[in-house]
Amino acid sequence: MKTKAILLMVFFLGWVTTGWAADHVKGDGKLTSKKISVTDYNEIKVDGVIDFNYEQSDDPSTVEVTVDQNLHPYVNIEVKDRVLTIAFKGAKVDHFTKFIVKTNSKWLAAAKVSGNANFMVNSPLTGDETVIKANANSLVQLKETVTVGKLDLNVSGSANMVVNHLEADKIECDIDGSGSITIKKGNAK
């Protein structure tokens, strides 16, 4: 019994000190942009309050982040197994003015969008197969023509998707929750 009490106390102290260890930062209101080159990717994972702008392009992949000047050191940009993820790391960010990302790659096989993210594809999108999943309260907008063999759209929670123009051999849509998928015009089998 004595050992359990000691272990419980050590666990509790470790848990409390871990909470104190994280830096809490707030944005300073001075928006700045930084642009870097990244290795090529074909999948994107977005989570949180972020305006994410994607373009399909033959140009080398880059990421431009606009956020409060003092928060740039906490922005983590990582490409692992051809998956791009961007998030705050190393601090608990309590408030920021804006968090805007602009990026490009040669093609997009998949995107997973969650939280209150706003994910916009601002160029024509082409490829064999593209899977886009959105959940929570996110918004996905495919603003230009999407020409793919198969487009798989999955919405859960209160997420919404808007496809302005679709040209696909096959489309699959799945909605779970109060979200929506809107296809304004186009053709699919």
Predicted regions and their residues:
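Intrinsically disordered, low-complexity terminal regions
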Residues: 1-189
